[in-house]
Structures are given as C-alpha cells and as structure tokens.
C-alpha cells in the first residue's frame, strides 16, 4: 500500500506552500466549494486542501500512499474545519465501500497514478449515484508546441524527478471515458505569468456519476 518517494515528498512539501501563496490556495477553495456529506480525497498529499472544506462536509477520508506526506497529512488533520480520517491507500484500490461517498476529490494526482483508467473506475465505484468528482489537475496542452515539449519531458527525466508524474495526459477525456458527465470545467495556466512550462496547463472542474 505504500509508495515511497522520500526526496519528492520533501520537495513537494515546500513547493506546495509556495504554490498556495502564488494562487493555488484560491484554486483549492474552488475545488471543494459547495461540497457536503462524506468526501474521499485521493492522494491527499500533505493536506493543503483540508483548510478549505466547507462545514456541510460531515467527514473527509484522506487517502495518501506516500508515508512522509501521509505523516504531514496526519499532522494537519486536527486543524481542519471538518472531521478528517487519514488512511494509507492507492487510487487504484481505495479502502472505501461501494457507493458510500458523496464526493471524490482528486487534486494533482491523476498526473502520477500508474493507471488513470483504474483510478477513475475506483472513484466511480465509491461514489453514490449522482455523486460528484471534483478535479484539479495539470493536463495536456492545447497548443502543439507545448504538447511537443510535454512529450519530450514525459519521455525523459520528468517522471523520474517527479514521482511518476506525466505532463501530457488528457485527463478530461479520461474522466469522460470513465463514464462521468463533466458539468463544470475551467482551463487556465498556472502559474499565470512567465513562460509556460510542461506542467502549466491546468483544469479545475466537476463531474457527476450517473
């Protein structure tokens, strides 16, 4: 159940704070706004989404496979505005009963799961009919030049340096192919200024399990 990336975990812990200061915190608030009931957050990392959950959420099961990130997540859980339970687990094998969640939250995780199809199938399995999939991910670029740069990055050092992360995944298409209906979708660049990099194109949205 454990996925160990000690160097990446240390780097990500620092980088996530800087990202939030640069505007990611606002995206995290939008990601979970309006949620209610029981939520499963997959690949919850070091818990940067936890402060933003609204009070209508009755509980969050925060699943994280990397031990160091999970320890940071556990430390952050008591300060969350809603009850949080931390668990070890993989996106492809969630420790959750069928049709038991009102929402599943995916935040910068579908870029690095070994199998998006299986991970999204699991998300659909644990959601009740009509439940929401909320997603905030970096994705394949819409411009040919940046797509070429992403393919080069994915074929060389990027996955090795970033714990299996891939930049050229068409995550929105994968969500639709998994049987979800996308009801909200915002495409943007992050960070918003400077020269775009392989991980600059982002999406934030919501999908519904029929």
Q: Predicted regions span which residues?
A:
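A short SAM/SAH-binding and catalytic strip from SAM-dependent methyltransferases
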Residues: 102-115
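Short alpha-helix
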Residues: 164-179
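A short glycine-rich, Lys/Arg-flanked "PGG" loop and its adjoining helix->strand segment in the class I
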Residues: 117-129
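Class I SAM-dependent methyltransferase SAM/SAH-binding core
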Residues: 40-93
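Conserved alpha-helix/loop element of class I SAM-dependent methyltransferases that forms part
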Residues: 15-38, 48-52
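Conserved beta-strand signature within the Rossmann-like core of class I S-adenosyl-L-methionine
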Residues: 130-138
